[in-house]
Amino acid sequence: IPADPVCVIYLLMADYAYRYYGDKSVCESEYEHLKAWVEYLKSRSKGYITDYYYYGDWVLPYPETVQPDNIFVSTAYLFWHLKEMKKIAEIVGNKADIALYKKDIELCRKAINDKYFDAETKNYSRGTQTENALAVSLGICAEKHTAEVAENVYKDVVARNYHCTSGNVGYRHVFYVLAEYGHADAVVKILKN
């Protein structure tokens, strides 16, 4: 049984070894395995929308009536895998794969926006904190809409008396988005709750 699509740490470890230590040996030695994992995830999607999940945004702090669409969460993580694989291809200098993953990133971004973005409400999927934060944090959201989608994350946090409704997969992205879009104070309030 393959891992959940939200298991991006394999690629992040290779990227971080290079980013923080200048060591590209992990990227080089693991390259074919990293690529095989990403290609497997691509094979489990139709038009860049994944077809499975095991956990999605798991361990939500409260029983929410509206929970994140776990296929959306897995698909957003497919997008993140594609971005990470392109970075790793750049680190090792694989020009063909750089071009391949650049194209995949754009096609995946388009598929997610076409299927999940509501241009009227400026929400992704069901409009949960996780879904909107993933879209902004990972770069799925079009730049012209990022501030509005980020503001929807903030408004939802405020409406819930500074509580985060995201689980293990989404909370960090909620914090990233709040901090990046001028609401670091909201992160502090969430943590104090």
Question: What residue spans do the PLM features occupy?
Answer:
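Active-site core of glycosidic bond-cleaving carbohydrate-active enzymes
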Residues: I1-N193
